[in-house]
């Protein structure tokens, strides 16, 4: 929701550089900063007298321990996260664990030691982008659309929204970076009015990498399957050069500069410059640093071939998400009409060559500015949300959720409510019930992943990712109707609601805590494991379903024969037969927890063969034989017995 008055802006909050745009005079204006540059370094420096934003990058070598960069790599992460620990080895910054294991950046400011969370640092960058926009527009700005990598999890998205709040902004929407690039591409091509197109966005920036396949048709932008690495980009390519030259300096001069902040930062700046030079037409460049450490100068040369060799595994790593994106989208590479390059790191010739080779020599689309495309799309989205960009109101962006979301039901089964690649925002609900007679409450545990068993998936949010619904009135198992709702908003943030429809008891949770969701590595690992163990998962799932079907049928029969509202009376002999058979089945289940699927199914058929004819005769007395299985019978709740075809809702049980 936009605030009253003023324009809304779009901000690309990047790992290394940020950019801001606004919709004005029927077009997007990418706004230059006070130095005349259309992108601003995402750097923040603290001195004895002031704070420097953006321009801080120019004095980083003189003040390395107090110049903060790469803050985006800390957003929404915990201190002990592997990527945080890995990055800390390369930073001249001091990072310590804060409350709740939140990484805190330590700097000296005005003679005092201060600690800042990544959200605070990023908010300072946002404030700078806000000031740039306000200086250009001549009035205050309250509303903004802010971009994030496609695979940012719930806690990272919420942390980004918090960053906006700290900066005094109303964050109208958190939007995925490749989707913004897609909007920029779509508007660039709109004048030619192309038919339906499959467009692959290849977004390789300073710290993150996103791939998305989108279909454009008549102003509708539908995301098919996003893939991402939230820890891969130009900074990592720089690190390879830095490590190479640290080793070279040690070999030639017997001096180790790995822990020397000033020397390391000067070397890193030179390496970034060399990378940019090698990405242009130059095949070789030199690095010259006077008095790098203890009066020793450093001079070396680096060729493009050597640079490519040092980073080849990372370059090839960029192709894996492309392949997975196409596979999940069920689209062949030959069906991709355009491959759009976004992000400064796509200027690297070897990256372009590998991508072109992957698509069998297809010409890559370079018509949009890779540094500005994301901010461009964000500005368009901001205009639409604020009601300003009426000319673009026919543009509809359909995003998706990257992994399946569900909860744990009886037997540790992952019951999926929202499958992966579902278009968001979305809202799905399902009826569940109790597992035991007179059960006073249920535990709702939210999971994310593709495995059949919840123990193989990731519990979302740990302590905040589960909640209890208590106060359920005493009733036989399977009778209470518990409505569970999963609601994902347009920002990709999940809310879970649960309500006992009989008693009116309610509870809810928003999965936004600092424990976070899945990192890219965890996602890739889970998907690989899911592929590897798919057959095993299916077998386990079948066993649990067969066991639950037998158990549900047995308890439903027990409840049915005890129900005094049953029309007609059971013959005493028939009632005893059912009681005996049910007790034997339950006892057999308790003794055979590891029974195979066929054994469980045979036992169920045996029990059905005895009970069904008796129950059918009971209902035939009134001429209203129930349709479907015993899950539809009186007293049985909605057990969801195998083979049931009743029209009632399918209800699964929650421990």
From Swiss-Prot:
The record's listing under Gene3D superfamilies reads:
1.20.1270.10, 3.30.30.30, 3.30.420.40, Actin, Chain A, domain 4, Substrate Binding Domain Of DNAk, Chain A, domain 1
| Organism listed in the record | Daucus carota (Wild carrot)
In residue numbers, the region (Disordered) covers 622-655
Which is one GO molecular function term here? Answer: ATP binding
What domain of life does the UniProt record list for this protein's source? Eukaryota
Q: Name one Pfam family in it.
A: HSP70
Coiled-coil stretches are none
Nucleotide-binding listed as a keyword: yes
Which keywords does UniProt give here?
ATP-binding, Nucleotide-binding, Stress response
Q: Which family does this protein fall into? A: Belongs to the heat shock protein 70 family.
Q: Under what name is this protein listed?
A: Heat shock 70 kDa protein
Q: Where is the composition biased (Gly residues)?
A: 626-646
Query: Which InterPro entries does the record cross-reference, listed alphabetically?
Result: ATPase_NBD, Heat_shock_70_CS, HSP70_C_sf, HSP70_peptide-bd_sf, Hsp_70_fam
């Amino acid at each position: 929701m936009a605030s009253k008055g003023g324009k809304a802006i779009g901000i690309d909050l990047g790992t290394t550089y940020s950019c801001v745009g606004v919709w004005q005079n029927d077009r997007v204006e990418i706004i230059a900063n006070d130095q005349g540059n259309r992108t601003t370094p995402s750097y923040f420096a603290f001195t004895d007298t002031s704070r420097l934003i953006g321009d801080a990058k120019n004095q980083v070598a003189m003040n390395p321990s107090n110049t903060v960069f790469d803050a985006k790599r800390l957003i929404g992460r915990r201190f002990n996260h592997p990527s945080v620990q890995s990055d800390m080895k390369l930073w001249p910054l001091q990072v310590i664990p804060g409350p709740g294991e939140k990484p805190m950046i330590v700097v000296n400011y005005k003679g005092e030691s201060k600690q800042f969370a990544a959200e605070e640092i990023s908010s300072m960058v946002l404030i700078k982008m806000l000031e740039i926009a306000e200086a250009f527009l001549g009035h205050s700005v309250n509303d903004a659309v802010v971009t994030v990598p496609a695979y940012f999890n719930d806690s990272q998205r919420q942390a980004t929204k918090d960053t906006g709040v700290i900066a005094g902004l109303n964050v109208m929407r958190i939007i995925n970076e490749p989707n913004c690039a897609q909007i920029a591409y779509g508007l660039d091509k709109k004048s030619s009015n192309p038919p339906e197109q499959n467009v692959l966005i290849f977004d390789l920036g300073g710290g993150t990498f996103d791939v998305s396949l989108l279909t454009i048709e008549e102003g509708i932008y539908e995301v098919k399957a996003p893939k991402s690495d939230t820890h891969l980009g130009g900074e990592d390519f720089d690190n390879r050069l830095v490590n190479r030259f640290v080793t070279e300096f040690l070999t030639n001069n017997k001096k180790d500069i790995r822990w020397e902040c000033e020397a390391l930062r000067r070397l890193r700046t030179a390496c970034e410059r060399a990378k940019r030079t090698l990405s242009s037409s130059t095949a070789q460049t030199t690095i010259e640093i006077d008095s790098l450490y203890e009066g020793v100068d450093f001079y070396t040369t680096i060729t493009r071939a050597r640079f490519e060799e040092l980073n080849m595994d990372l370059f090839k790593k960029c192709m894996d998400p492309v392949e997975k994106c196409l596979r999940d989208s069920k689209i062949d590479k030959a069906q991709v009409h355009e491959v759009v390059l976004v992000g400064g790191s796509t200027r690297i010739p070897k990256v372009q060559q590998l991508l072109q080779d992957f698509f069998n020599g297809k010409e890559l689309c370079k018509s949009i500015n890779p540094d500005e495309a994301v901010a461009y799309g964000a500005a368009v989205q901001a205009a639409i949300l604020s009601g300003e960009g009426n000319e673009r109101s026919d543009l509809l962006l359909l995003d998706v959720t990257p992994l399946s979301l569900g909860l744990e039901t009886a037997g540790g089964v992952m019951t999926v409510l929202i499958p992966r690649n579902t278009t968001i925002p979305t809202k799905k609900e399902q009826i569940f019930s109790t597992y035991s007679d007179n059960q006073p409450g249920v535990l709702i545990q939210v999971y994310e992943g593709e495995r059949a068993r919840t123990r193989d998936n990731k519990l979302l949010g740990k302590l905040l990712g589960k909640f209890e619904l208590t106060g359920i009135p005493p009733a036989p198992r399977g009778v209470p109707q518990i409505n569970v709702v999963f609601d994902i908003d347009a920002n990709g943030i999940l809310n879970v609601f649960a309500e006992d429809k009989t008693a009116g008891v309610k509870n809810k949770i928003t999965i936004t805590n600092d424990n976070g969701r899945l990192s890219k590595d965890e996602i890739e690992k889970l998907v690989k494991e899911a592929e590897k163990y798919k057959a095993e998962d299916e077998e386990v799932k079948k066993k649990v379903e067969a066991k639950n079907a037998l158990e549900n049928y047995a308890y439903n029969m027990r409840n049915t024969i005890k129900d005094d509202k049953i029309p007609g009376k059971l013959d005493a002999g028939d009632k005893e037969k059912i009681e005996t058979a049910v007790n034997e089945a339950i006892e057999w289940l308790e003794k055979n927890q590891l029974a195979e699927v066929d054994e469980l199914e045979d036992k169920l058929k045996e029990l059905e063969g005895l009970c069904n004819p008796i129950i059918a005769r009971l209902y035939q007395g009134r001429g209203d034989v129930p349709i479907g299985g015993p899950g539809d019978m009186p007293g049985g709740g909605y057990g969801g017995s195998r083979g049931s075809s009743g029209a009632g809702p399918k209800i699964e049980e929650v421990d």
